[in-house]
Amino acid sequence: MPFCQVVVGPPGSGKSTYCFGMYQLLSAIGRSSIIVNLDPANDFIKYPCAIDIRKVLDVEMIQKDYDLGPNGALIYAMEAIEYHVEWLLKELKKHRDSYVIFDCPGQVELFTNHNSLQKIIKTLEKELDYRPVSVQLVDAYCCTNPSAYVSALLVCLKGMLQLDMPHVNILSKADLLCTYGTLPMKLDFFTEVQDLSYLAPLLDRDKRLQRYSDLNKAICELVEDFNLVSFEVVAVENKASMLRVLRKIDQAGGYAYGSTEIGGDAVWVNAVRQGGDPLQGISPQERWIDKKEEYDKYEWELEQKSTMDEDENEG
């Protein structure tokens, strides 16, 4: 029963960086994993790529041959993957014992409106018994701008409904939050997505948005009515935050409650089942803004102690 992450999000949200960071983390805890690049327009891949869609699809050639723009070419490419999904199935069968991370294109409509990505993943579920979790990244910078945050909420909600699978939303680049100045609300407000009516006065301060006051209010009410969207907070370079989000993903997809034979990381799975997060109960505001340096040091000391304990046990 293979498990996978389907990593989506708008351009600049840090998808490829996250994929590489997650791959490194999984390797560190002993879980066999691979990254699959599904973005034919991704020209700067820094991670080891087990399956690369660019080997069979050239987005520049698609633009030239079919007189399409960049967005149209990506839609065409995704439809081509869907139509020729047997190629992807064949490649994935070579890695049946690996946990898979899919790095998807950043074109928003591919995971909010278009059906090809969803159909591809559904085919993997049916043919290879995959257990996917959609991981949607949003740049934490949106928390500095209420209108950008409302837009991110709507994209996340639409993505969750469109992809129709277990879903984890992430505010990425959390380590930069302390450099943005004072946020309009505490970070906890943005992660919990509760009482969005408090955003209305902030949105109305911008004269350009006052004419859209009713629309913004309706969007906030819509998000609250569904009560589906919330965010985890991640800094890829911070191992502890990546471990926390992996714990959430494993719980969402069922990895933490199933067999450990595929991943080979029984120690990690048992830890997830038992809990044990040393910073459990610490608010995102406190961790990433109010006392960031203090908790950075604390987590570093914990990691050093853990490394020393492992060395002693091996000795």
Curated annotation (Swiss-Prot):
Its main location: cytoplasm. Heterodimers with gpn1 or fet5/gpn3. Binds to RNA polymerase II (RNAPII). One of its GO terms (molecular function) is GTPase activity. CDD domains: GPN2. Small GTPase required for proper nuclear import of RNA polymerase II and III (RNAPII and RNAPIII). May act at an RNAP assembly step prior to nuclear import. Its EC number is 3.6.5.-. It is found in: Cytoplasm; Nucleus. The keyword RNA-binding does not apply. A motif (Gly-Pro-Asn (GPN)-loop) lies at residues 69-71. This is GPN-loop GTPase 2. It comes from Schizosaccharomyces pombe (strain 972 / ATCC 24843).
